Amino acid sequence: LVYADDVPATDDPVVANIRAAGGIVLCKTNTPEFGAGGNSRNDVHGATGNPFDPTKTCGGSSGGSAVALATGMAPLATGSDYGGSLRTPSSFCGVVGFRPSPGLVPSVDKAAALTPWGVIGPMGRSVEDAHLLLLAQADYDKRDPFSGDDYARLPEALSGIDLASVRVAISADLGCAPVDSNIRKTFAERVGTFRGVFAEAQDRDPDLGPQIHDVFEILRGLTFLTSHHDRLKKTPDKLGPNVTYHTQRGLERSAADVAWAQVEQGKIMKRYMALFDEVDVLIAPAASVSPFPHSQWHPTEMNGEKLDNYMRWLAISYGITMALTVSASIPCGVDHLGMPFGIQVAGPNGSDAIVLEIAHSLERHLAANKATARPLPNLNKLAGKGKPKAMA
């Protein structure tokens, strides 16, 4: 509601980069308020349904982008990612989302400039398409303290990589995330179809540690406090429950809490990076649940156990964020309910090019198997028409 009637006078720098590269900007798509949460609904535009079942969520926060891609409304789309904001909707809608290293795509509007966890990235219907958009998005911008010349090292085109030379770690839950039992089963089945193509595939969790949830809660609260404290004081009636929750959590923390979380986050990152002394990438589910009804803000329980807060079901995503890593979410068939299922291919910070190459090659391998190929929504059914029409 805060920006219900707002029309920006200028483009965001990333949009300006896309235009400068020859991109044609079509529209804006729906998100949850200020990108808070994994369900794209808000009090201005309502909820965006999933193209495979409009009664269910498309994910969030970049849910509208994922739907536009899945239904053919747009060939490319931008997304953002803090707790999985482009990876979750990519998984829920059967498209590709890429979380790049901090600073690769400049972000200049953060209230707290020295926070690297929220990034901007590309989304597409294939890894190649996402890479194409990344080339347009990525650039140096002196207003982003994490920006540098890494963009210059991105390949102009993806050539792929021999998966038989790649070592992978496979983790169903990152060693810390609640994951629905049916999603675990689907993940195990899908991994069984492709683990043999790699040079080495070991079942191994990254060492993210038991404090990761508290670390995330504190640092996310800090981020929301820097952006929304004044709004919470002046116009609390215009803020939804998710933004209010994290801003209030930020107010409850002390400087000592924030200092502790900063130190622990550094330890998490270093332990995670050590994994890549022995493997090239980590493969995990891209979402912990099947898409749920968009009428509910978020899952409140999993496997019969209550979830602590509205973000806990996203730990499979924010665990990756807290490690400051690169991650590509790619489609991998459908789950037990016939909804899109995705996996994430993650690497260490700075490994954008190699993660894209591996994800591209794995995507091609998955496309050859009906059980793991990218699913397509029934557009005629969505439009109330007859037989489904194939979409490229």
Where are these regions (language model features)?
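Acyltransferase
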Residues: 11-19, 155, 181-205, 229-234, ...
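Short, well-ordered beta-strand elements
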Residues: 122, 339-348, 355-356
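Short helix-loop capping/hinge segments that flank enzyme active sites or metal/cofactor-binding pockets
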Residues: 1, 160-171, 218-273, 285, ...
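A short helix-breaking turn/cap at a secondary-structure junction
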Residues: 99-185, 189, 364-392
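Conserved hydrophobic/aromatic pocket- or pore-lining residues that grip, position, or stack substrates
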Residues: 18, 46, 130, 194, ...
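Gly/Ser-rich catalytic/binding loops embedded in alpha/beta enzyme cores
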Residues: 1-82, 192, 270, 274-275
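Small-aliphatic-rich amphipathic alpha-helix that forms the alpha element of a beta-alpha
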Residues: 271-274, 305-330
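Short, surface-exposed loop/helix-turn segments at secondary-structure junctions
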Residues: 1-4, 44, 147, 260, ...
